[in-house]
Amino acid sequence: MKIPKKVRRYCPYCKKHTIHIVEKAKKGKPSELTWGQRQFRRVTAGYGGFPRPLPDRSKPVKKIDLRFKCTECGKMHTKANGCFRSGRFEFVEK
């Protein structure tokens, strides 16, 4: 799927249509100090198996999460109807 790098969209902060720069959301660095991660380390420590069943399979394509950055106010927002699935994904100049 080909998506333009710059699109004209409605900015909910400016409350008008402006040019937006389209970016793909990147995965953040996971925190080792969250409660779930601490519990997981405690359970998997020592002898014994994995504490929960392993996932059988993954989906064939991942979801694409797009972020739109307004060129006037600089604020970023997401698509109203969320992200979508796409096998191939690239930005193109319009």
Curated annotation (Swiss-Prot):
The UniProt keywords, alphabetically, are: Metal-binding, Ribonucleoprotein, Ribosomal protein, RNA-binding, rRNA-binding, Zinc, Zinc-finger
- Which residues are in coiled coils? none
Q: Where are the zinc fingers (C4-type)?
A: 11-73
Binding residues annotated for Zn(2+), in chain numbering: C11, C14, C70, C73
Recorded hits in PROSITE patterns, A to Z, give: RIBOSOMAL_L44E (PS01172)
Reply yes or no: does the keyword Lyase apply. no
Alphabetical list of Pfam families matching this protein: Ribosomal_L44
**Cofactor: binding details:** Binds 1 zinc ion per subunit.
Query: Which coenzyme or cofactor does it need?
Result: Zn(2+)
Q: Which GO terms describe its cellular component?
A: cytosolic large ribosomal subunit
UniProt cross-references to Gene3D superfamilies, sorted A to Z: 3.10.450.80
Q: Any S-S bridges, and between which cysteines?
A: none
Q: Which GO terms describe its biological process?
A: translation
Q: Name one GO molecular function term.
A: zinc ion binding
> What quaternary structure, including any partners, is listed in this protein's UniProt entry?
Part of the 50S ribosomal subunit.
| UniProt record similarity statement | Belongs to the eukaryotic ribosomal protein eL42 family.
Cited function: Binds to the 23S rRNA.
Q: What is this protein called?
A: Large ribosomal subunit protein eL42
Instruction: Give the source species.
Output: Methanocaldococcus jannaschii (strain ATCC 43067 / DSM 2661 / JAL-1 / JCM 10045 / NBRC 100440)
